[in-house]
Design a protein with these regions (language model features):
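Short helix/turn-capping signatures at newly exposed starts of structured segments
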Residues: 1-126, 137-138, 144-169
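Active-site beta-strand termini and strand-to-loop segments that position acidic
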Residues: 131-136
Length: 169
């Protein structure tokens, strides 16, 4: 853990973060909202008082940094789970923290590549995305910027929607 301007910067160690990613990605899908809530609680994530689909992780500085998305066709099912793997900064990281973000991002990519094969990668001025499409049709999207690292695990139904949209283009 590092401190920047009085704020603590936290990172899930890659072993722990990858274990959480695997638990979600390798879960039986479709996943019910109650199964997602059980995983949320198992990971020690704190739900918002008024909405259990929004939560706070241990790497947060107290703000909500995770979300469980409902499937649009059946709200008892989950479409995605999104959470931060680091504290979210409000300005670009100082060099020492930028180095931590970059090295941790690389460690996550290496660990997930060793589990799921080579990812596809997109980069922009804002940051980088690595995407793994699993045989189960679950997708893992790891994002890194100069301010944070996050991950989205999307259901097979989301991949079906993405493919349908691509066919329409």
């Amino acid at each position: 853990m590092s401190t920047i301007k009085g704020e603590q910067f936290r990172v899930y160690p890659p072993e722990e973060g990858v274990a959480i990613i695997r638990a979600i990605a390798e879960h039986r899908w479709p996943m019910t909202i109650n199964e997602a809530f059980a995983l949320r609680d198992q990971f020690g994530w704190r739900p918002a008082p008024d909405d259990g689909t929004i939560f706070t992780t241990p790497v947060s500085n107290g703000e909500e940094d995770g979300y469980i998305g409902n499937d649009v066709t059946d709200t008892s099912l989950v479409s995605r789970i999104n959470f931060n793997l680091t504290t979210r900064l409000y300005s670009d990281a100082e060099p020492q923290i930028d180095h931590i973000i970059r090295s941790q991002y690389k460690a996550y990519v290496d660990a997930l590549n060793s589990l799921y094969g080579q990812s596809s990668m997109e980069s922009s001025a804002v940051g980088v995305l690595n995407v793994w499409n699993l045989r189960s049709r679950v997708s893992i999207v790891l994002g890194g910027t100069r301010r944070f690292i996050d991950v989205v695990i999307e259901s097979p139904a989301m991949m079906d929607l993405t493919e349908a949209e691509q066919r329409l283009r």
